[in-house]
A protein has these predicted regions:
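A cross-family signal for N-terminal binding/gating loops and helix N-caps
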Residues: 1-107, 112-114, 245-248, 261-271
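Catalytic cores of large soluble enzymes that bind and process phosphate-bearing ligands
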Residues: 2, 6, 139, 198
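Basic, nucleic-acid-binding surfaces and adjacent catalytic neighborhoods in DNA/RNA-processing proteins
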Residues: 22-41, 54, 59, 70, ...
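Phosphate/anion-contacting hairpin/loop surfaces
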Residues: 65, 69-170, 175-182, 190
Length: 271
């Protein structure tokens, strides 16, 4: 699943390519991928000029003058910016026809991704964005006390809590493993047992890892690969996720499922 750094990489490429172009038509081949009524969505997106792209957490925001189209890639979503002779395969579910003659194709093998339109006045006050937690790449001074209350209000493993997008936006399975390793926190620890100092470390390490991963254009492993000519390199800097040995103490890393998600950690370095 693309996490914040991968979505930011997509945003940067699409912002460069699409800004100033109009969406002239839309082919929707799998209607369930559109959260809105189809006619409402088309009426509010067709003939709109893309003035830029923004992002909040894992949500891409295609900005128009009077509103925005939101896209969430979920597990397998990918965009292809292509010429009109591009071969349309069965996994391409939405095709945007652009004013320069090119196509923006959305491919999603799992069909989990979603699109919707929101007016400017409701963009951040209605779902999905109203439910998104703090984005540490945009907020350099988050309220630690508020985050501490949200986290310690839960008794589930801290790994599972940090995957909740209403707390820290953009963290997914890969980066939660890395953040907890750098913070010396066992992913099985109950969330209500973390200290406010632990939360501060989680925030600091999330910021650091997000920024480094963005500089390296994200992590390219398993199903997340580039569809826009950009290959991520951060997989070369991962400390524990998919690894077998702790880089610090050289112990064999633990590989176990927590909340249904494969998790990697060092039981000696993480308490």
């Amino acid at each position: 699943m693309p996490e914040l750094p991968e979505v930011e990489t997509v945003r940067r490429v699409l912002n460069e390519e699409l800004s100033g172009l109009e969406i002239k038509d839309i082919d929707i081949r799998y209607p369930n991928i559109i959260e809105d009524d189809i006619d409402y969505f088309k009426n509010n997106v067709i003939n709109k000029k893309i003035v830029g792209l923004d992002r909040l957490g894992k949500h891409l925001i295609f900005l128009f003058n009077d509103g925005a189209m939101l896209s969430h890639l979920r597990m397998e979503g990918k965009f292809f910016y292509v010429n009109p002779d591009f071969e349309i395969n069965k996994h391409i579910h939405v095709i945007f026809h652009l004013s320069n003659g090119k196509l923006l194709c959305y491919q999603d093998v799992r069909k989990f991704g979603r699109f919707c339109y929101r007016e400017n006045k409701e963009l951040y006050t209605t779902p999905p964005l109203v439910n998104v937690g703090v984005d540490l790449t945009k907020n350099n001074n988050p309220n630690i006390n508020e985050l501490y209350k949200k986290i310690t209000n839960k008794r589930i493993p801290i790994k599972t809590t940090l995957l909740d997008q209403s707390i820290i936006a953009g963290l997914g399975n890969i980066y939660v493993d890395e953040v907890l390793y750098e913070s010396h926190i066992n992913p099985n620890r109950a969330s209500n047992l973390v200290s406010i100092g632990d939360v501060s470390n989680i925030v600091l390490n999330s910021e650091k890892i997000f920024n480094n991963a963005i500089l390296n254009k994200g992590t390219t492993i398993r199903s997340y690969t580039s569809s826009l000519g950009v290959i991520g390199n951060y997989q070369n800097f991962l400390k524990v996720h998919t690894k077998t040995e702790c880089p610090c103490c050289k112990s064999t890393l633990i590989r176990v499922k927590i909340g249904g998600r494969m998790t990697y950690f060092c039981e000696k370095c993480q308490r």
